Swiss-Prot record:
Pathway: Cell wall biogenesis; peptidoglycan biosynthesis. The gene is mraY. It is found in: Cell membrane. It catalyses: UDP-N-acetyl-alpha-D-muramoyl-L-alanyl-gamma-D-glutamyl-meso-2,6-diaminopimeloyl-D-alanyl-D-alanine + di-trans,octa-cis-undecaprenyl phosphate = di-trans,octa-cis-undecaprenyl diphospho-N-acetyl-alpha-D-muramoyl-L-alanyl-D-glutamyl-meso-2,6-diaminopimeloyl-D-alanyl-D-alanine + UMP. It is an enzyme of class 2 (transferase). Its EC number is 2.7.8.13. The lineage of its organism: Bacteria, Bacillati, Bacillota, Clostridia, Eubacteriales. Pfam families: Glycos_transf_4. InterPro entries: Glycosyl_transferase_4, PNAcMuramoyl-5peptid_Trfase, PNAcMuramoyl-5peptid_Trfase_CS. GO terms for cellular component: plasma membrane. GO terms for molecular function: metal ion binding; phospho-N-acetylmuramoyl-pentapeptide-transferase activity; UDP-N-acetylmuramoyl-L-alanyl-D-glutamyl-meso-2,6-diaminopimelyl-D-alanyl-D-alanine:undecaprenyl-phosphate transferase activity. This is Phospho-N-acetylmuramoyl-pentapeptide-transferase. Catalyzes the initial step of the lipid cycle reactions in the biosynthesis of the cell wall peptidoglycan: transfers peptidoglycan precursor phospho-MurNAc-pentapeptide from UDP-MurNAc-pentapeptide onto the lipid carrier undecaprenyl phosphate, yielding undecaprenyl-pyrophosphoryl-MurNAc-pentapeptide, known as lipid I.
Length: 330
């Protein structure tokens, strides 16, 4: 159902602006509050020395965009209830991240939730979403570079595939969130991509709206998270963004396209897996430090340079994504 506005502005542009403005208002409220509560980030002892000064920077900043996205999407649900699964995944993953952050900063448990606790929560949300979709949506996915109408049915593999995509995307975004503005900027670009693609089909109206909300929230958050960051998104934000991006891609039948446009997420996650596997098998490290953004820092790149290069690569990957879909705008 299309949202009718009393003035001449595209609905997705309108919610983008609203989400952006809402996050701009929340930032100056949440940052001092989290600072007073001493909800500060703990920096890795083995990380780049330039990051030591970030110790104590308030975390859990993902609320700056998670709250606007949730509120706006909830209002939009009155027009189109199909947006509810997107809210469920994003808010569900975000709440798990919030609990994880809370344990880190309040209970002073460095790793937050235990691995099995966090994975149980993520799987619970992911499986619920996947089972719901198996009863309400087809199991088709679009094959890159074959056109948007070329799909393959996953059949009984659909549910485990959806779960895999959600768990992988949320962990990949979480890993990417290691430099000021990196995860938020990459996700902003990726969600703008999905917003544009969703404009090509009327049945994706609700996805277009939600993706625009996420993009607007990310842009607003970036004003506080760009170098030098005044706040970090924490797992509250990274898990929510990973869930949102994964769910959007699944509902648009584009998880394989996400591998392309979200190439930075993929490389970041792979760098960690390669590093761990190499060290276990050979006792040697492939990278100076993983994730790979730290490798570039230790190679002499400034933090801002790494972020800008990764943003630029994401823009180029999104252009490749358009070619992979062979979109026809008319």
């Amino acid at each position: 159902m299309k949202l009718n506005l009393p003035f001449n502005i595209s609905p997705h542009v309108f919610v983008f602006i609203l989400s952006f403005a809402f996050s701009l208002i929340l930032g100056p409220v949440l940052i001092p509050m989290l600072t007073r509560l001493k909800f500060g980030q703990t920096v890795r002892d083995d990380g780049p020395k330039t990051h030591y000064k970030k110790t104590g920077t308030p975390t859990m900043g993902g609320m700056i965009f998670l709250i606007p996205v949730t509120v706006l999407a909830a209002f939009y649900a009155g027009h189109d209830r199909r947006i509810l699964p997107l809210i469920f995944v994003t808010l569900g993953f975000g709440l798990i991240g919030f609990i994880d952050d809370f344990i880190k900063v309040v209970k002073k448990r460095k790793d937050g939730l235990y691995w099995n606790q966090k994975m149980f929560g993520l799987l619970l949300v992911a499986v619920t979403f996947a089972v719901y979709l198996s009863h309400t949506h087809t199991s088709d996915i679009i094959i890159p570079f074959m056109g948007m109408d070329k799909t393959v049915s996953l059949g009984w593999l659909f549910v485990p595939f959806v779960v895999l995509v959600l768990i992988a995307s949320t962990n990949a975004v979480n890993i990417t969130d290691g430099l000021d503005g990196l995860a938020a900027g990459v996700t902003l670009i990726v969600t703008v991509f999905f917003t544009i693609v969703a404009m090509t089909r009327s049945e994706w109206e609700y996805i277009k709206m939600f993706s625009a909300m996420v993009a607007g929230g990310c842009l607003g958050f970036l004003t506080f998270n760009a170098y030098p960051a005044r706040i970090f998104m924490g797992d509250t934000g990274s898990l929510a963004l990973g869930g949102a991006v994964g769910a959007i891609a699944i509902l648009m039948k584009m998880p394989l396209i996400l591998l392309i446009v979200g190439g930075i997420y993929v490389v970041e996650a792979l760098s960690v897996m390669i590093q761990v596997l190499s060290f276990k098998l050979t006792g040697k490290r492939v990278f100076k430090m993983a994730p790979i953004h730290h490798h570039f820092e230790l190679s002499g790149w400034k933090e801002v340079k790494v972020v800008l290069v990764f943003w630029t690569i994401t823009v180029l990957l999104c252009i490749l994504g358009f070619f992979a879909l062979r979109l026809k705008f008319y």
